[in-house]
Amino acid sequence: VDELLSEEAVRPRYPYESIVEYDIDEIKHFDIKLGSVNHVKMRAGEGEKIKVQLVSDTIENLTELVKVKIDDIKRRIDVDVNRSKSLSEELVKEHLWIFINLPEKYMGDTELATHCEKLELFDIISEKFELDGAVKEIHIAGGNSHIELDNNSPMEIYVADYTGRIDVNQISAKSRLYVSHEYAFKAVKKGVRTKLLFEEHGNLVDDFSVAESENHIEINGINSELTIVKLSN
């Protein structure tokens, strides 16, 4: 029993992985297409490389079954992740994770297309960051940017220590965005038949946004609803 417990303790959480890296030496526009996966974690940091790491708990031979293609075209970097036809969409949506590191000093505008259960964005610093796809849960931590979430599925969005704009663009969807008790922001409602609601302690409350702030939260689209939830201390 002790031997089994010891083996379990040292066993990696993701036994299968594939890593692709590429050196960058100037500011680039990133166009990243990941397709369907379970979880995407993207971080901007030091260094001069883009690193794409695929990991899985069940999919062996990731390098052969899931291909990462990086194209350097003038001032643009295209990243495409394509799975083998032998892997079903259901399988990768449950058992494939993608971790991406981007060089902060070379980040221009960034476009991300993916369908996933969870997306985490850490320290993203760029003029504009645009998500196109279907994501159920989004975490935005740190960074300074203008983030556009173009997603027609209901979202749970968590914001912490982020500076800048967040635009929620949806059609016929209801989403919730969570902020800390001390987070100050300006709220803007645009679009057609959109609703902007505010919630605290489980109850709808009056608008608790401020008139002017470097942080903007905007709802846009058609027949969509965004509830901004203030979390307790």
Short names for language-model regions:
Residues 85-87, 130, 137-139, 148:
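Domain-wide signal for the mature, well-folded portions of proteins, strongly enriched
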Residues 87-91, 116, 172:
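Flexible, surface-exposed loop/linker segments and immediately adjacent secondary-structure boundaries
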Residues 2-74, 93, 97-113, 118-124, ...:
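Short linear S-[DN]-x-LW-Φ motif typified by the pepsin-like aspartic protease active-site region
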Residues 138-233:
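Short, surface-exposed interaction patches in beta-rich subdomains
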